Curated annotation (Swiss-Prot):
Catalytic activity: N(6)-[(R)-S(8)-aminomethyldihydrolipoyl]-L-lysyl-[protein] + (6S)-5,6,7,8-tetrahydrofolate = N(6)-[(R)-dihydrolipoyl]-L-lysyl-[protein] + (6R)-5,10-methylene-5,6,7,8-tetrahydrofolate + NH4(+)
Domain of life per record: Bacteria
Subunit structure, as described in the record: The glycine cleavage system is composed of four proteins: P, T, L and H.
EC number: 2.1.2.10
BP GO terms, sorted: glycine decarboxylation via glycine cleavage system
SUPFAM superfamilies: Aminomethyltransferase beta-barrel domain, Folate-binding domain
InterPro entries: GCS_T, GCS_T_bac, GCST_C, GCV_T_N, GcvT/YgfZ/DmdA, GcvT/YgfZ_C, TrmE/GcvT_dom1
GO CC term (a single one): cytosol
Protein name: Aminomethyltransferase
Length: 365
């Protein structure tokens, strides 16, 4: 039996088509995925992300523990509330999960991890936390709502108390603050400004209804996927998993190689991969008719005349751009053009950096 978030009845009342998403009944769309996508790019939309797992870590050695557990380095987090994005790797350098970690106090950090990886994440964290005396608290008492879009902050602020408005004033991206009952973070998965707000489950229905009244449009998993794809953001299980190196998933920037004496899980394997070379994640654009779909083959010929093949990890029509885009994992040496096999047709595609739209503006020519 699939689980329900506290907002399940609200989704049904809004006309959602509900689907099983990694064991959770979640809204795919509320009638029009395209309209929901445009609402987030042009105005303000909201997502129920209560299926994600919030984990609080406490203990005197929490920072030391996270410096070992994560590929990025929480030593960078010196200002309370500051967050960073990181991979959590296995010993062979594969990605167990990608997550956000918040520094709250010297003995208190918060992680937000994916729903699909919840059980293995918790088991892995608990196993490695024990020697450090770090205590885990899974915050199943909290719901999580993402409010995203150019008008998102303004609309959300109409629900805030004076204390909460003051707490978020001038807050830069990738920060979080506890203000009253709300944990308000300037993070998201859309390439737009906005907040991800954690609050007690018993308050979330009222909060959702007030956001609706403020003109924030509900958006489902379908729009969430096209928005994150346009923004060039990875989806766990597609761009990366335990068999894929972060170096092959456009996550090299999340690996803190310095200081050289910091040992973290997967470091030794990553150093070998970096020396040997890995596949890479690229963006693809196809302006001709047709749609780039997951798992389609991508072929190119390198400068030496050798033919290579990769695979599309995520592909879709881009509502913002009006043509098809994709992320693809390919061997090194790809140039500016490639071929994608769509049924019996070989379609030319342009190769770009991963990332096509940010803050409503195209990044591509």
């Amino acid at each position: 039996m699939a689980k329900q978030t506290p907002l399940y009845d609200q989704h049904v009342a809004c006309g959602a088509r509900m689907v099983d998403f990694h064991g959770w009944m979640m809204p795919l769309h509320y009638g029009s995925q395209i309209d929901e996508h445009h609402a987030v790019r042009q105005d303000a939309g909201m997502f129920d992300v209560s299926h994600m797992t919030i984990v609080d870590l406490r203990g005197a050695r929490t920072r030391e523990f996270l410096r070992y557990l994560l590929a990025n380095d929480v030593a960078k987090l010196t200002q309370p509330g500051k967050a960073l994005y990181t991979g959590m790797l296995n010993a062979s350098g594969g990605v167990i999960d990608d997550l956000i970690v918040y520094f709250l106090t010297e003995d208190y950090f918060r992680l937000v991890v994916n729903s699909a990886t919840r059980e293995k994440d918790l088991a892995w964290i608990e196993e490695h936390a024990a020697p450090y005396g770090v205590a885990l608290t899974v915050r199943d008492d909290l719901a999580l709502v993402a409010v995203q879009g150019p008008q998102a902050k303004e609309r959300a602020a109409t629900l805030f108390t004076p204390e909460q408005k003051s707490a978020v004033e001038g807050m830069k991206p990738f920060f979080g603050v506890q203000a009253g009952d709300l944990f308000i973070a300037t993070t998201g998965y859309t390439g737009e400004a906005g907040y991800e707000i954690a609050l007690p489950k018993e308050q979330v229905v009222d909060f959702w209804q007030k956001l609706l009244a403020a003109g924030v449009k509900p958006a489902g998993l379908g729009a969430r996927d096209t928005l994150r794809l346009e923004a060039g953001m990875n989806l766990y299980g597609q761009e990366m998993d335990e068999g894929v190196s972060p170096l092959a998933a456009n996550m090299g920037w999340t690996i803190a190689w310095l200081p050289e004496d910091r040992q973290f899980i997967g470091r030794e394997a990553l150093e070998k991969q970096r020396e040997m070379g890995t596949e890479q994640l690229v963006g693809l654009i196809m302006t001709e008719k047709g749609v780039l779909r997951n798992e389609l083959p991508v072929r190119f010929t390198d400068e030496a005349g050798q033919t290579h093949e990769g695979i599309i990890t995520s592909g879709s029509f881009s509502p913002t751009l009006g043509f098809s885009i994709a992320l693809a994992r390919v061997p090194a040496g790809i140039g500016e053009q490639a071929i994608v096999q769509i049924r019996n047709r070989e379609m030319p595609v342009k190769v770009t950096k991963p990332g096509f739209v940010r803050a409503g503006k195209p990044l591509t020519n």
